[in-house]
Amino acid sequence: MKLNTLSPAAGAKSAAKRVGRGIGSGLGKTAGRGHKGQKSRSGGGVRVGFEGGQMPLKIRLPKFGFTSRKAMVTAEIRVSELAKVNGDVVDLNALKDANLVTRNIQFAKVVLSGTIERPVTVKGLKVTKGARAAIEAAGGKIEE
């Protein structure tokens, strides 16, 4: 198989519409745009969400909620991912070195998902009850 022998499957690509090429084509004269009006003009049309001057739904509905700025710098780590960290001590810098969290992360929480076989010491990270039980069952410990 070579790149120059590849071609699309039969019926996968349809021919482009050739508009304004006579009435026999079915797309002549007005080219499928109907008669007059804003949408028939070149560059015509209205922006997304415009309702003809009526107060748009987006503005009629109330604002709600916000984006927590702390959530942007907080990561969630699975128990199964702790095995990917080199060494026995797991802290934020160890997670960054193992590429489990990005450089901008300032807080991390270990959650129960998967299993861990080897004992590790978790330092300076928040840990859920289930994750704490799994880490301690594997012989590890949690240091605040």
Curated annotation (Swiss-Prot):
Disulfide bonds: none
One GO CC annotation: cytosolic large ribosomal subunit
UniProt keywords, alphabetically: Ribonucleoprotein, Ribosomal protein, RNA-binding, rRNA-binding
GO molecular function: rRNA binding; structural constituent of ribosome
Membrane-crossing segments per the record: none
Listed Gly residues bias regions: 21-31
GO BP terms, alphabetized: translation
Subunit record text: Part of the 50S ribosomal subunit.
Family according to the record: Belongs to the universal ribosomal protein uL15 family.
Name of the protein: Large ribosomal subunit protein uL15
Biological source species: Shewanella loihica (strain ATCC BAA-1088 / PV-4)
Gene expressing this chain: rplO
